[in-house]
Amino acid sequence: MRSIRWWALLVLFCLFLAACGGGGDKESQGDLGEQAQAACTGSELTEAPELPTGWPDMGEVTYTQQSDQGPTKVVEGYFDGDIEAAHDDFKRELQAAGFTILFDELEDHDSEVSWKGEGRSGQVALREECGSSDKIYVHVTNRPA
């Protein structure tokens, strides 16, 4: 009888753990999806994006929204092309403009290029979240170095 109670408690505990796990991830992914869709479908900014002096002007990139998060400036939009082209273009153009690449990574559906220059540092995060593999969500953060 004791072993049945112990197994029943173990099963209840496992069910409790299963019910608690995973919810936060889905919620944050939903928020990210909405944020990316807004950036991917928005109109081009009417004012200049708040990016460091000397930031490369890339014809394939359209910036559609920007915000401040404390001292960090966030600029978002989209890149016309695939993830590999976006990664390679940002890395090449940032280096050509005199920015130091601190880290970069290219995966199947996302990419990051971390940079430093002009007294600022940040990251260009690129993700296939615009609904097409040839239109890439761009999320640029930049803050005082």
Question: What do the PLM-derived regions correspond to, one by one?
Answer:
Residues 2-11, 16, 21-145:
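An acidic-aromatic pocket/loop used at catalytic or ligand-binding sites
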